[in-house]
């Protein structure tokens, strides 16, 4: 697949283990131009350490705190000015406090609930609002979800609720933006060791269960998920919108 001449925004790279980095690697190999958003200078420094691993020269890095509406608007205005327009966006932003990802869901705090839903779900809506203003015809948006948004899973708690809201947002955004020719989809990735997953209680047992019960008897990696994101952002997926595509070695089909 050749994506030369296409420009994509990648949101959510924390380090080399990030799923967003897997998508960046996949898109880079296909010749795409990448624009990265980061939360703050600490994440900028982490990103700059690994950018040299990519084949292309991707030098546009824009600060964007998704909890700040004015900063989101300013970030996409800057991206539009520097690129002339984008062809797609990957949203891989989620957060819940570590205490919220252990024990019982009934112990979720009001503040923890608000933060998780704001950062993990509402952020897709506000990002889409501003991304659409600089999106070229036939553009695409992809976000990241997890099976815990469909099923109750131990310790995932408020993040599962946030992912359920995110998946519903994908469908409503697909309807909303479809008339502008913009597609919106989600990839439901299997468990992967990332900075975010390290906060989930007893994460090792989740990985072990996938190896034992998934049809492929193994876990997936960042690049496998990244390749799927690249597919959804490309014209090869031009007829797909409002979809949640599972990349989890088939685990989601198991009873």
Model-derived segments and their meaning:
Residues 12-25, 94-133, 137-179, 191-193, ...:
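Catalytic loop of short-chain dehydrogenase/reductase
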């Amino acid at each position: 697949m050749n994506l030369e001449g296409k420009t994509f925004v990648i949101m959510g790279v924390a380090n080399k283990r990030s799923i967003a980095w897997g998508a960046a690697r996949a898109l880079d190999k296909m010749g795409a131009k990448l624009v990265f958003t980061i939360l703050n200078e600490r994440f900028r420094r982490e990103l700059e350490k690994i950018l040299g691993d990519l084949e292309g020269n991707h030098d546009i890095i824009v600060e964007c705190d998704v909890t700040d509406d004015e900063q989101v608007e300013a970030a996409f205005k800057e991206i539009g000015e520097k690129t002339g327009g984008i062809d797609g966006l990957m949203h891989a932003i989620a957060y819940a406090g570590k205490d919220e990802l252990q024990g019982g869901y009934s112990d979720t705090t009001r503040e923890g609930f608000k933060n998780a839903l704001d950062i993990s779900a509402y952020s897709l809506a506000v990002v889409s609002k501003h991304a659409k203003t600089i999106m070229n015809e036939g553009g695409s948006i992809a976000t990241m979800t997890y099976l815990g948004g469909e099923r109750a899973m131990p310790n995932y708690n408020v993040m599962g609720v946030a992912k359920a809201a995110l998946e519903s947002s994908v469908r409503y955004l697909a309807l909303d933006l479809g008339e502008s020719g913009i597609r919106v989809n989600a990839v439901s990735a299997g468990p992967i060791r990332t900075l975010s997953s390290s906060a989930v209680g007893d994460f090792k047992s989740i990985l072990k269960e996938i190896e034992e019960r998934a049809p492929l008897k193994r876990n997936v990696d960042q690049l496998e998920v990244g390749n799927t994101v690249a597919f959804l952002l490309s014209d090869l997926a031009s007829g797909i919108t409002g979809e949640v595509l599972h990349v989890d070695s088939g685990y989601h089909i198991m009873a």
